[in-house]
Swiss-Prot record:
GO biological process, one term: glycolytic process
Gene this protein is translated from: ALDOA
The EC number(s) this enzyme carries: 4.1.2.13
Keyword Membrane applies: no
Additional observations: In vertebrates, three forms of this ubiquitous glycolytic enzyme are found, aldolase A in muscle, aldolase B in liver and aldolase C in brain.
Function: Plays a key role in glycolysis and gluconeogenesis.
DNA-binding found in the keyword field: no
Protein name as annotated: Fructose-bisphosphate aldolase A
Record keywords: Allergen, Glycolysis, Lyase
Pathway(s) it belongs to: Carbohydrate degradation; glycolysis; D-glyceraldehyde 3-phosphate and glycerone phosphate from D-glucose: step 4/4
Lineage of producing organism: Eukaryota, Metazoa, Chordata, Craniata, Vertebrata
Source species, domain of life: Eukaryota
Assembly mode: Tetramer.
């Protein structure tokens, strides 16, 4: 699971 589920898919892509 992602640590930032509240972020948009684009934001998670930067992570």
């Amino acid at each position: 699971p992602h640590a930032y589920p509240f972020l948009s898919p684009e934001q998670k892509k930067e992570l």
